[in-house]
UniProtKB/Swiss-Prot annotation:
CDD domains: AdoMet_MTases. Its main location: cytoplasm. Its EC number is 2.1.1.182. The keyword Translocase does not apply. The keyword Transferase applies. This is Ribosomal RNA small subunit methyltransferase A. One of its GO terms (molecular function) is RNA binding. It comes from Rickettsia conorii (strain ATCC VR-613 / Malish 7). It catalyses: adenosine(1518)/adenosine(1519) in 16S rRNA + 4 S-adenosyl-L-methionine = N(6)-dimethyladenosine(1518)/N(6)-dimethyladenosine(1519) in 16S rRNA + 4 S-adenosyl-L-homocysteine + 4 H(+).
Length: 301
């Protein structure tokens, strides 16, 4: 029988390190609550980034997924995770920096060498050259469900990367800084609304699940966290369009208080004609445009 999460960490002398952005969760009930929020289906193929001392890992495994692959960069955590694997052979452990992982390649590698069940081996892997559209290849046989407590300093970057590979993802249930979650879920004409809101909502259905107080962690961070769930849309915009939206929103929100006709005039010389054609008020500021408005502008460029 495995010891408690905290005792297991103590036995292996695994203390949180600032350089890894580590704040450990020792509360198994909180870990269970996160997994419940994911609505994890039995026999799912799950990916977790930064398992650390394995609290969330245990809760996922108790739901009997087909497999759980964890990506951990801290070598100190590996013996602890390997002990969990003795009880759950469907746990796959990869030592790697999450920022260096390409989800497309990882999915195929896991299928062929690490342990995901792969029932249609004649299907060729999707390479970056082929995967031009975020939602293409719906018949992909190795979609993953991502459940993770992400380090604050890389969380936003990972979310954007994963959304661009949404064809490989069933859903993402993530713990992030509360401020980031509020930005992801924000609606137009609110203070939190910005580039992150636009990109996330064009590719996925987003839902804030619940807040997590600093006292839930060891050591307690200085800010609140929150759980967010993102479910990729069935027919999201192409990567090419999303890249254009990123370019447009970068300019638009850089001058947040400027009217859109001013902030975009260098990128879109005929901005007045474009706004008129799309029936968008030319006195609107960046925060007043809905995600679909930015997409419509991108489609015209």
């Amino acid at each position: 029988m495995l010891p408690s999460i905290a005792k297991h960490a103590a036995l292996h002398q695994v203390n949180p390190l600032k350089k890894h952005g580590q704040n450990f969760i020792f509360d198994s009930s909180l870990c269970d609550k996160i997994v419940r929020a994911s609505n994890l289906a039995e026999n799912s193929r799950v990916l977790e980034i930064g398992p650390g001392t394995g609290g969330l890992t245990r809760s996922i495994l108790q739901k009997n997924p087909e497999s759980l692959t964890v990506i951990e960069t801290d070598a100190r955590c590996l013996p602890l995770l390997n002990e969990i694997k003795e009880y759950y052979p469907n746990l796959n452990i990869i030592k790697q920096d999450a920022l260096k992982i390409n989800l497309t390649d990882l999915s195929y590698d896991i299928v062929n060498s690490v342990g995901f069940a792969y029932k249609k081996r004649e299907v060729k892997p999707i390479t970056n050259r082929r995967a031009n559209d975020i939602g293409e290849s719906k018949s992909i046989d190795y979609k993953v469900t991502i459940i993770s407590n992400l380090p604050y300093h890389i969380g936003t970057e990972l979310v954007i990367r994963w959304l661009k590979e949404a064809r490989l993802i069933t859903s993402m249930t993530l713990m992030l800084q509360k401020e980031v979650v509020e930005r992801i879920c924000a609606i137009p004409s609110t203070k939190a609304y910005g580039r992150l809101s636009v990109i996330c909502q064009l590719i996925a259905k987003v839902e804030k699940c619940f807040d997590v107080a600093p006292t839930a962690f060891y050591p307690p961070p200085k800010v609140y966290s929150a759980i967010v769930k993102l479910i990729p849309l069935e027919n999201p915009p192409s990567i090419a369009l999303i890249n254009k939206v990123e370019q447009i929103t970068k300019l638009a929100f850089a001058g947040r208080r400027k009217m859109i006709k001013s902030s975009l005039k260098n990128l879109v010389p005929n901005i007045y004609e474009v706004l008129t054609q799309l029936k968008i008020n030319d006195n609107y500021r960046a925060e007043n445009l809905a995600p679909q408005d930015y997409l419509r502008i991108a489609e015209i460029l």
